[in-house]
């Protein structure tokens, strides 16, 4: 019986670790976080419960790794209107 409980807990922990995503997080205005420094993005991503992040210089937007599935990300454009 204890073995079955152990397997159930281990499985749920493993699934939780696998359910992470990456991408450009965005704010309440549907805009990506503009950046110039990697440290700013790394701190932002960790605040959003991600593992790490960096400033993608080509489009000057924060890119995060290991975000929870509940965090919204935009794969393309920098800013979107709410309408």
Swiss-Prot record:
InterPro entries: LCN-type_CS_alpha_beta_dom, Scorpion_toxin-like, Scorpion_toxin-like_sf, Scorpion_toxinL, Scorpion_toxinL/defensin
Coiled-coil regions listed: none
Keyword Signal: yes
Keyword presence, Membrane: no
Cystine bridges: 31-79, 35-55, 41-62, 45-64
Residues making up the signal peptide according to the UniProt record: 1-19
Role description: Binds voltage-independently at site-3 of voltage-gated sodium channels (Nav) and inhibits the inactivation of the activated channels, thereby blocking neuronal transmission.
Protein name: Neurotoxin LmNaTx10
Organism: Lychas mucronatus
